From Swiss-Prot:
This is Pyrrolocin cluster transcription factor fsdR. CDD domains: fungal_TF_MHR, GAL4. Transcription factor that regulates the expression of the gene cluster that mediates the biosynthesis of pyrrolocin. It comes from Fungal sp. (strain NRRL 50135). GO terms for cellular component: nucleus. One of its GO terms (molecular function) is DNA-binding transcription factor activity, RNA polymerase II-specific. The lineage of its organism: Eukaryota, Fungi.
């Protein structure tokens, strides 16, 4: 009943498709000869392929079942004993009561009956005397003594410390949905982890595929179809040999007044201290042809990014009648041609400089090129994730995963810059991998690079022989936000492992990680700790966005950690606090979504920094939406389930009405973005399905252009079709641009090649915070 590919086990649950068969399809209708005369060949094909009379490749699951989306129901006949009495097995599938065709309401009732029947069969398989105890089976919770109850703090909200009786030491074995989901289509194969928002929504919609088929013709709209991009992204991975030479590329650099304006905007708006680059920039104009080709690529990347930023600030990519003026299409086209020209030159410089070998300016140019490719990206390409992989590999090749203190030939200044670059790469890797639902590339066990220090750029330079001690975190420096985010992500990587690893983890590990999330959140610098909008009235909008983003990260980690305890197979009371923590975190994120939406309007506190927001939060907003959709749908199913026992009741009451109100507000926000966002249309489809008649049919917001204008972004969620229900919505290119949220882009000194005169001396951008 799911697209997830799960390991084959001895206790399989028949799928809905296998229930909806006639009695002639079963194998038990044929009379069988006595055991003494029986010489049947062993059945090597799965049951489904045998019924369809097609060749089976005997995999677990087989390719035929996987291609049809029935991987979890791919079953093989049990081995029959050769002597003695045959083992008693259930081979006949109970028929679906009533006719197979009827109204939508009747079909919905039958689906609900099937869900109850399947859960009953699962319980029967797990508790039957002839079957082995399943690792998914949970014994009844042990009673908690008064002493244990008194020792448990009664803290409400997502910051509660979850404390339970000693049974928390047993393993929480992964369920089939914990292994993630694989989608096999003619266009390719895609995988997302179980913690991805699309996989969560897919768990709601798997049994409703027939609704998508009935409404498919009605829901498809040609107005959503957008032409494909001219080039696949990232272009660097698809570029062929370069016909240009370094001399011809340098000759194509615009006149200095043009470049001066571009770099001025780049440094001022993107928060980069230009001191280190300025010296090299002056040297470049003295002898342009003497500059390393990789530095020229760095220059073109900065020029390209500055032009894209101008597009974002002026809104050249989209007309805006609400702003009281019109924009010339020719102006937008000319600006885009300039962007493409600068980007092409940066790619040529990377290729001519043999970027895979590493060296001075390589990582800086690759990182800025990555941002250029993602700046107006409508639909996250998996190639972008592969580009991040290239950046990680080049960094490891150059030894960035090892702390510079191990190597005496690296100066203190260069070593600190390397730490800043590595910190940015770690954040980039975690962000992109998480939003794509894929494993991260950097393994903590293989790195020992220290955190960068909390220092101002003026605290040290290339002549420094010993780094000063880190400033107290009460002082705001360009690296303070990076440090705060790194500490949250240090817990985040552990949470991701527990949530997605196929091996079981004890519930005590879950509780310990929950405690670590609370500690990391409490340890955030006071200047970056979110305590409500009322305490942020006298701080810059950039700081407000940083505070909100750190709070969203902390709540997102709570969701990923506790999400699996929302599943029907884990409804025991001793998991009630996990469910409460997960739902509370999701509700807080949607409250922040509403706040960000309100404050990015023309009269809001975040209006001047709205370009920094873009879709930096999009993946976590979608994750929270999917969690509350799952909760609301599960609550509706529980109301129909008369067999629910008291031990399965929630440990803490859930305010369903508040959840419904949050989802209605979220529906309004997502609906305004449907014209350009595929992910928004998926969210709207799920919300309208779950909310039903209570879903608000919103009208376009008068400030829609403010939210949908292109802005820099670097990592958005992508999943090519998470369930058959979503196929009823035509989902073209994604329109919410991705963002690098709060990463810094320092360029560092590298003394790896002292033969390159002043070009190998200083290569330093200091800070570039693109979303906060």
């Amino acid at each position: 009943m799911s697209d997830a590919v799960t390991p084959c086990s001895s206790a399989k649950v028949p799928s809905v498709q296998e229930f909806i068969t006639t009695s002639s399809d079963t194998q038990t209708d044929r009379p069988r000869p006595p055991l003494s005369r029986r010489r049947d060949k062993p059945q090597l094909s799965c049951n489904a392929c045998r019924r369809r009379k097609v060749r089976c490749d005997r995999l677990h699951p087989c390719s035929n079942c996987s291609s049809r989306g029935h991987g979890s129901s791919c079953e093989y006949a049990p081995t029959t004993p050769t002597t003695g009495t045959a083992a008693s097995t259930i081979t006949e599938k109970p028929p679906l009561p009533g006719p197979l065709h009827g109204t939508a309401s009747n079909m919905q009732n039958r689906i609900d009956q099937l869900e109850s029947l399947v859960l009953g069969l699962m319980h029967q398989h797990q508790t039957g005397p002839s079957s082995r105890a399943s690792p998914l089976e949970e014994p009844p919770p042990r009673p908690i003594t008064p002493d244990q109850r008194a020792a448990s703090p009664s803290v409400t909200g997502s910051d509660r410390i979850l404390t339970f009786a000693p049974e928390t030491q047993r393993d929480v074995s992964p369920t089939p949905s914990d292994y993630g989901s694989i989608r096999i289509q003619q266009t390719g194969v895609s995988y997302v982890s179980s913690s991805h928002w699309a996989a969560i929504l897919g768990s709601i919609a798997d049994l409703r595929s027939h609704f998508a088929q009935e409404d498919e013709a009605h829901s498809r709209s040609a107005s959503h179809v957008q032409p494909p991009t001219a080039f696949p992204k990232p272009q660097l991975l698809y570029s062929s040999l370069v016909n240009e030479t370094p001399a011809s590329i340098v000759k194509s650099v615009p006149p200095r007044p043009v470049v001066d304006r571009l770099l001025s905007r780049y440094f001022n708006v993107l928060d980069i201290a230009p001191a280190y680059v300025r010296q090299q920039y002056e040297e470049f104009w003295k002898a342009p042809h003497a500059a390393p080709i990789m530095w020229v690529g760095l220059l073109f990347s900065m020029m390209c990014l500055s032009t894209q930023l101008q597009q974002a600030l002026l809104g050249l990519n989209k007309p805006s009648p609400t702003l009281g003026h019109s924009r010339r299409p020719s102006q937008a086209a000319e600006s885009q041609e300039t962007v493409e020209s600068y980007k092409e030159k940066a790619i040529q410089c990377l290729i001519l400089g043999h970027y895979t070998k590493g060296g001075p300016y390589v990582l800086e140019t690759l990182i800025l090129y990555f941002l250029v490719e993602c700046f107006h990206l409508k639909d996250m390409e998996v190639g972008v994730w592969m580009l991040v992989g290239n950046i990680v590999q080049v960094a490891i090749l150059m030894g960035y995963h090892r702390d510079a203190d191990h190597f005496p030939n690296i100066s203190p200044f260069a070593g600190e810059m390397r730490r800043r670059v590595w910190a940015m790469i770690v954040q980039l890797d975690f962000s992109i991998s998480t939003q794509l639902g894929l494993p991260r590339l950097v393994k903590e066990s293989q790195t020992d690079t220290a955190e960068p220090r909390n220092l101002h750029d003026s605290d040290f330079d290339e002549l420094t022989t010993e780094l000063p001690t880190s400033r107290p975190e009460t002082e705001v420096t360009p690296t303070l936000y990076v440090l705060a985010k790194l500490r949250l992500l240090s817990v985040g990587v552990k949470v991701a492992d527990v949530a997605t690893e196929p091996r079981p983890h004890s519930y005590a590990e879950v509780l310990e990680l929950d405690h670590q999330i609370n500690e990391a959140r409490s340890a955030l610098p006071s200047s970056l700790k979110w305590s409500g909008l009322g305490s942020s009235l006298n701080v810059p909008s950039q700081i407000i966005i940083q505070r909100i983003w750190l709070e969203v990260i902390a709540q997102q980690l709570k969701i990923v950690l506790h999400r699996k305890f929302l599943e029907p197979s884990r409804l025991q009371q001793h998991y009630g606090s996990s469910r409460s923590a997960c739902l509370t975190a999701a509700m807080k994120i949607l409250q922040l979504q509403r706040l960000v939406d309100e404050e990015t309007q023309a009269d809001g506190l975040l209006y001047q920094s709205r370009w920094r927001v873009s879709s930096a939060f999009i993946n976590d907003f979608l994750l929270a939406t999917s969690i509350l959709c799952f909760c609301l749908q599960s609550h509706a199913d529980e109301q129909k389930d008369t067999n629910r026992t008291s031990k399965d009741a929630e440990a803490a009451p859930v305010d369903i009405e508040e959840i419904r109100q949050l989802l209605n507000t979220s529906l309004v926000i997502w609906s305004r973005q449907c014209a350009s966002s595929r992910e928004a249309r998926r969210a709207v489809a799920a919300l309208r399905y779950v909310l039903g008649d209570s879903g608000i049919r919103s009208e376009p917001h008068p400030s829609e252009d403010v939210l949908s204008a292109p802005v820099p972004a670097a990592a958005i969620s992508y999943f090519p079709g998470f369930s058959d229900l979503m196929t009823e919505y035509d989902l073209p290119s994604l329109g919410l641009e991705p963002t690098i949220e709060g990463t810094t882009w320092p360029v560092f000194t590298t003394n790896l090649n002292n033969n390159i005169d002043h070009w190998a001396g200083v290569t330093g951008f200091q800070q570039m915070d693109l979303s906060s």
